[in-house]
Amino acid sequence: MAALAKTATSHIADELIAQAVASIKAAEHFSFPFPHIFFRDFFPTDFYQDLLRNIPTEGYDPITGTGTRMALRLYGDNVEKIEPELRSAWAAVSAMLTSKEVERAIRIKLNDGLEIRARGDKVPSAEDLKLVAKPVVYSDSDGYQIKPHPDTRKKVVTMQLYCPADTSQQALGTTLYRASLKGLMHVGSYCLEPVKTIPFFPNVGYAFVVLKAYHSLTKMSWHGRPTIKTDRPRISILNTFYMNEHVGF
């Protein structure tokens, strides 16, 4: 791991936090089909390139019965499962993603969605919603898919960081949907209308507030991924903010 392994985790984490917060602050905000943001340059460029060369190979668990999705948890003691020579950098990534600074940046940028969520959850305001970050590295292989879904109510904010080496996997991003009459023509997407696919570009990502029917019938956070075709893993980091520390993956 060379330079990264020799640098103190806390120093790396501070640099990562500063970059991540700046990225989120500069993110594009969209309210259609539901409140979400798209951000670029989430990691410092040199760190990102080094990180890609040092994706962990140990500590993953299968998520799908087909084995097309493998997951490596990056929170709590799970970081200790990562190879020792890679651990300091990934511990810094974990510290950044679970930091109060990143949480605050997300709260500010997605305040409109959090206000909708708060009303549906019957809490006084968005500030009363608890956000507990639990990041996970995902490695998806050829054939992986997940049908459109709004996410479980245990999740308050879903945030995904794309980690490809180049733009050749750009078609493999997450698709956002909405319920509409046009959706009846899209049997493959369970009669939901695809609105857009967020390109799977290097060092970019998105985040949205999880909204169910009781939060808003017109702003439900429908998203999914049609079957991917790829000759190499699709690597991403899902940083999910849960409603409390007792739930999550």
List each model region and its residues.
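Non-heme Fe(II)/2-oxoglutarate
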Residues: A26-G113
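Phosphate/oxyanion-binding loops and surfaces in catalytic or ligand/nucleic-acid-binding neighborhoods
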Residues: N54, E58, D166, N244
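Active-site rim elements
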Residues: I37, E83, R87-L97, E101, ...
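Catalytic core of Fe(II)/2-oxoglutarate
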Residues: A2, G143, P150-K155, L172-F249
